[in-house]
Amino acid sequence: MMSHIARFLTLAVLLGGFSATAAAQVPAKPDPEVKAKLAELKKLANVRKGAKDSEAITVISDLEVKFEKMHPKDQKDYAKALGLVLIGSRTKRKPEQSQIFRTIILALGRAGKLGSPYLAKSFDSKKFKDKDWINLRGQMLDHLGRTKDSKYIKFLLDEALKNINDTLMAKAGGALKNYDGEKLSVRKDVCKNLIKKFAQIHDNGNVNLDPGDSTVKMWKNKERAVSEPWNAALQKLTKQHLRGPDKWTRFWNKNKSKNWDKPLKKSRR
């Protein structure tokens, strides 16, 4: 009896020590050094023509390393500061000077739900509407998905279904693969819409065999652009290993009412 009590007390002490250690990792109050670094970042980023961007990137990298162990207020202020540099009118750059923006997008993606609002807002910002910013905007969508913030599932799905740019459609649909941990009903809704659009793109690219038909060519190019990322997203969300709109359509018709989180009878590939 005493040995059982002794083991229980030992376990309690160990667990208590673990909890105390975990709690100790979260600072009791905001760090003045973080505040100073954020002020420095703002100053560097606002220098005309991006003359101090390399120094600003160093500051961002230094802060990102500390993010997980920051006080919650510091984490929030950090994400906000990054977002303001990304979206702010005083930090305009030419596309060939985009490294600071790419660094920020990466950092915001790693900041989870604190970073997602700024990624979504920057994607819609007039600052990046010119076609030369397409690839950067695609990166915004990619890292918005990596935040795993469920508030932006609809945002990403809408871009995948409605955006007319092939790159952005592809990136938005591909970013949805990060939501494989969502409940089944959410994943099914995403898959239903993505599969339907995938099939539509495929069908429009095969209405005739005329290689000179510019409309058919446009749809074929679109299918080539979305195929890899959309297949990857559907595979993650369904836990299947199919490829191509025809196979996904058959899978959906056969299994839309089934529990995908349990082993399904394998579909023919």
Report the location of each language-model feature.
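Bacterial N-terminal signal peptides that target proteins for export
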Residues: 1-10, 16
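Terminal, low-structured helical/coil segments at or just beyond the last alpha-helical repeat
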Residues: 235-269
